[in-house]
Every structure is written in structure tokens, then in C-alpha cells.
Amino acid sequence: MGSGEADRGILICGTGIGMCIAANKVSGVRAAPCHDDLTAEMSRRHNDLNVLCLSADLLSQKVIDRLIKIWLETEFEGGRHARRVEKITDIESRQSPSGA
């Protein structure tokens, strides 16, 4: 995402939280931990999440597989949600050292 080599990523650690914090330090990344069908779907549909963070310790393999499938198959709705994502991107660009 940050370098443009990939459109999306999936990170898995104990809770999914540490990976999420680290991923969100990379410009252009919008990462969140998802733990159920609704968070996986809405993270894409309303927030255009491009990095899915999952817990290996708290979720079964069956649930992880299902969440990945939902997340990969769900499209961003755009519209009013796109404006919110643009605001987030604007804040990010103002916070980066290069200003870009």
C-alpha cells in the first residue's frame, strides 16, 4: 500500500491490535482489527479499509477464513463515505514529514 506494490494486505498476530497500530504508521494504509462478519464487511463498505488485521489467538481458523472472504469480496460504497476517507487522507498528508 505505502509503496504502491499492493492494493490490500492481511496481517495476523496474537490479538491483531499490535499489527494494526504498526500498519497505520505507513502512509496510505487504513488498517483495523476485525473480529466478526459485520466489522469485516463494514470496514470495507464504509471505510475502504485496505489492511485487515486479525487475531490468531482469539479467532478460530474457520472464522479467520470467513472474515477474509467477506473482506475480500466487499466493495467500498463511496459516496458520503468517500468524503470521510478523503478527510482522513488529507489529515495524513498534513502529518507526514514530506507534506505529501
Residues covered by each model-derived region:
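Hydrophobic residues within well-ordered alpha-helices
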Residues: 1, 23, 43-44
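Structural motif
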Residues: 12-13, 34, 54
